[in-house]
Amino acid sequence: IPLGGEPIELLIAGNVVATAMTGGDGRAFLSYIPKAKGSLPFTVRVGTTSKVAMVEAAANLAVWERRTPIIAVEMASLMEAPTAQGPTVTLPGKDAEGRQPMPDAASGLGKLTQFYYNVLYVVTEDKVVGANDLVSAQARQWLSDHKFPVGHILVLSSDPAAFGAKLDELHAAGWKTLKIGVGRTKAFAEAFLQRRLDAVMVPEPAMGEAPRKAKVAKDWKDVRKKM
């Protein structure tokens, strides 16, 4: 908000858990200590006493222990292949223009994350959509619309080496339980295999497209059998 002195509210499960006022630069700092582990959806909105129009934004807060296993999932592996050139994820309010999820992807990933894995969704930046925060917001909305488990969304450049570099960065920061990735592209699988980690490709790629040590699942029902 480009105004100072405006009230901002942080909501968890529909309840206001923190408030703050914007400073001269239009920013506000909200403090909240989570009471449980996992991925926590939250909303930030302009307070009811504000002089500006009601605005709100949603995001997810990852409250993860370093010892809990993490699975990285390439967003493209959750979606049916496009029949024509179109957006990577569903545009808000335009479901017909978006990509549909692969059969059983939401339920299959839900079973993996229910008791064991935290999930890191990896999506490629889209210059047509715009800034990475917009790409992240669209990805979050698409995942929510199609009942996928809540997780952290990571937006990376289209450079094939981008995820490998991020994987090294995460491991160096102590997130060494990120040892497996489920993806659609060869570059994504190779980022794990080159580091002696596990990779599952879904759906089954064309002949010769799967790296030698990658596990291949014909669909999401088959993914759990490969892990």
What are these regions (language model features)?
Residues 1-67:
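Beta-strand-enriched, solvent-exposed domains that form extended recognition/catalytic surfaces
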Residues 131-227:
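C-terminal cap/substrate-recognition subdomain and adjoining C-terminal extension
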Residues 4, 78-80, 218-219, 225:
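General structural signal for secondary-structure boundaries
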Residues 65-160:
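Conserved, compact domain cores that house catalytic/ligand-binding motifs in diverse enzymes
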Residues 39-42, 88-91, 170:
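A generic short-segment signal for beta-strand/edge and adjacent turn/coil regions
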Residues 42, 93-94, 201-202:
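Alpha-helix boundary/interfacial micro-motifs
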